[in-house]
């Protein structure tokens, strides 16, 4: 009876979690971040080469600056416009997930609405060669320009909210038949679709322009600043108040994986967008020669590199234990097939083939080991024992190399990741033995 109640609770938990993960706006957000991730990885590689590799060359300051123009150009086209790109991707993904027949129009609306809500006047720092620069005058108010503070990494949260609002409103208005322009049956579909959304698009952007004007005239501010102050900064602060919020979400997410539903259903729709923003901030800071602050030590890369070794639940350690110490032929067979994908952090064969799903002994280290590593790695970073993550690297990068790249080639991070593997093997081993004994008893009863 107790077992049935426990399973019933897990089933209900999985059902609720699946509904949360499949919520259309959260799913669209997850899809958009998945699409933009290669751009962030390219930016991370450029940041590493620009700030770690190029300075090793025997060049004077001018020569190094010329060489670093390459990486700066990549930063300009990736990190510095990432909010604009993300806004468009969210608009497109939301349209696809809502099965709207003109997703490109939604992309246009999202980008336009986002730019409309930006400040029309920005403060720019004067260059060292500017004739206007004096001891008292170091900046100037500029109109007709966009600030990378809004178009880049700092504007990601504004892009998310404005894109979701504008596209949701646009899709709603587009459903009103009276607002569609009928051109007749002989008109090509592409032309007809563009005219169908013309009036809804005009109305939508007019509403956002009115809101921007009212905020500027009546309050002397803009929506991007309000979102950053009231929503983005507090949420980032919660993520960096300690590892506890991240640990809680990944505990729930890995519990979900234990009943057969992918952990990204929860983590991908909740904390990962915020954690991704934090590592993107770190890349921009490092590219500018700045120092990573403690409130950015917790980010997506610290989770990927140090808490997902071999994939969710750090299952690479289980595979190594099985190959070295197991006497169960079925487990050995699965491990031999899964070890190569596991080295590249792909572990679905382990989750469903070993299996982890509904295997109570293995569920315990699967859930708790990543939590342990998140907490310890965060503590080591705060203590200055390992460097903070400054680059987003491909999640399929093998262990040790992964940690070295993420921290700007800090050898201590690579050593710590190797130690994690040893710790993980020690933690998994007794639970693997218990699981094998349980399987042996079940097989004996079946006979």
Put a short name on every predicted segment.
Residues 24, 28-49, 157-160, 164-168, ...:
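Core transmembrane alpha-helical segments of multi-pass membrane transporters/permeases
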Residues 3-12, 165-186, 210-227, 266-267, ...:
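Juxtamembrane interface elements at the cytosolic ends of transmembrane helices
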Residues 2-20, 59-68, 130, 139-140, ...:
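Transmembrane alpha-helical segments and their short flanking loops
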Residues 10-33, 67-68, 183-195, 349-351:
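Cytosolic juxtamembrane amphipathic/interface segments immediately preceding
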Residues 73-86, 151-158, 239-259, 294-313, ...:
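Hydrophobic alpha-helical transmembrane segments
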Residues 82-97, 163-173, 252-259, 265, ...:
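Transmembrane alpha-helical segments in integral membrane proteins
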Residues 18, 22-180, 357:
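Early transmembrane hairpin of solute transport permeases
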Residues 212-218, 222-326:
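Membrane-embedded translocation segments of transport machinery
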